[in-house]
C-alpha cells in the first residue's frame, strides 16, 4: 500500500519548511524549455552564463534564470 502525504516539496515550492521564491528545474527540464541539448545547458552552467545550484551530484536552475536568459539573448538578424 502506498502512502501519500500530499504534494512534494518541489511541487509546492517549499524547501525544508520555507517557501521558495522560484521553482527549481532540472538540467533536462531546462534543455526542453530552451530546445537545446543537456550538454548545452551544462556548458552554460559551467561557463557561468546560467546560474545554477548544486544539489548532490546534479544541478538545479531557477526558472527565473532561464526566463531571464531567454529574454535577454535575442539576436537581431536585420
Swiss-Prot record:
GO terms for molecular function: DNA binding. Pfam families: HTH_17. Keywords: DNA-binding. The keyword DNA-binding applies. Residues 24-45 bind DNA. InterPro entries: DNA-bd_dom_put_sf, HTH_17, SinI_DNA-bd. This is Putative DNA-binding protein MT0521.
